[in-house]
């Protein structure tokens, strides 16, 4: 019997939209059950070869947005990458969809925080969710990025129904 162990910092963001850190082979049976169509990978490094093989075997499209190579790793994720990720997230044709970075904390948390802003969540709730996944490693620059993020920069036509329910 296969064990179904979720990846580090796994969470459901919305219907058929998930978040986590980069999985390892113990997590693959769990991910298979999600029947993912696409994965947004936000880490600066390439995903592990094991994970790339899994994605290929499962016929999942891996979208590696990464980070600017010349950017300081302590800085928040770039606005350009967040907007690119949100455009993918807001296209229902990409579902079921999974967002991840190395540990599922900062880059993933920033993208999800900006998504919550599009959903018109209040900042207190957005930061509570960000902190729940970041734990003791909260980065105030990420929270500031989310707070100042201009949602008007994100254009979409046929967004998932849950976007309008908040």
Curated annotation (Swiss-Prot):
CDD domains referenced in this protein's UniProt entry, alphabetically: PFA-DSP_Oca1
GO molecular function: phosphatase activity; protein tyrosine phosphatase activity
Keyword Cytoplasm: yes
UniProt superkingdom: Eukaryota
Organism the protein comes from: Dictyostelium discoideum (Social amoeba)
Any GO CC annotation of this UniProt entry: cytoplasm
Protein name per the record: Probable tyrosine-protein phosphatase DG1060
Top EC class, one word: hydrolase
